Swiss-Prot record:
It comes from Arabidopsis thaliana. Residues 72-173 form the Glutaredoxin domain. GO terms for molecular function: 2 iron, 2 sulfur cluster binding; antiporter activity; metal ion binding. The GRXS14-BOLA1 apo-heterodimer model derived from NMR data shows a domain arrangement totally different from the holo-heterodimer showing evidence for a Rieske-type ligation of a [2Fe-2S] cluster. Disruption phenotype: Plants display high sensitivity to external oxidants, and their content of protein carbonylation is higher than wild-type plants. Induction: By sodium and magnesium chloride. Residues 97-100, 133-137 are annotated as: Required for CAX1 activation. This is Monothiol glutaredoxin-S14, chloroplastic. GO terms for biological process: monoatomic cation transport. The C-terminal region (79-168) is involved in BOLA recognition in GRXS-BOLA apo-heterodimer. Belongs to the glutaredoxin family. CGFS subfamily. The keyword Cell cycle does not apply.
Length: 173
């Protein structure tokens, strides 16, 4: 599988994913190609070369909801297992994302004990958590069993002192 920008001519074989960021909204198209065929992407136009090329979009499996009842129960147990829980990319010792690292540093600065959950280890957890919190991005911070926010909200609350107040309330309850 190859992922290339459509800004320059690209040769892709087997399975191709073509992304375009022309409108600042990435669009992806996935095609199955015969191994002897090729897909050339140039100036936002697709040209196909190969003998007897049959192009068809691949089928995507989309469930109605990634948040199964079992996963919802697991998430409820996780967010209530500690006073502060951070769902993040990576771990507190090795964050795999700048936003996750920012929230970890804020919590460490406040000397807040927290549980970290690496969402990169489980795709079902990652997708289900987006539905559970109704929040599309990570990290996701939970305080006292309630969703608090992502990186931007946490950073702003840290600057205003609101984060420390919420953490103190949760620790005392």
């Amino acid at each position: 599988m190859a992922l290339r920008s459509v800004k320059t001519p690209t040769l892709i074989t087997s399975v191709a994913v073509v992304s375009s960021s022309v409108t600042n909204k990435p669009h992806s198209i996935r095609f199955s190609l015969k191994p002897t065929s090729a897909l050339v992407v140039h100036n936002h136009q697709l040209s196909f070369y190969g003998s007897n090329l049959k192009l068809k979009p691949t089928k995507f499996r989309c469930s109605a909801s990634a948040l199964t009842p079992q996963l919802k129960d697991t998430l409820e147990k996780l967010v209530n297992s500690e006073k502060v829980v951070l769902f993040m990319k990576g771990t507190r010792d090795f964050p795999m994302c700048g936003f996750s690292n920012t929230v970890v540093q804020i919590l460490k600065n406040l000397n807040v004990p927290f549980e970290d959950v690496n969402i990169l280890e489980n795709e079902m957890l990652r997708q289900g958590l987006k539905e559970y919190s109704n929040w599309p991005t990570f990290p996701q911070l939970y305080i006292g069993g309630e969703f608090f926010g992502g990186c931007d909200i946490t950073l702003e609350a840290f600057k205003t002192g609101e984060l420390q107040e919420e953490v103190e309330k949760a620790m005392c309850s």
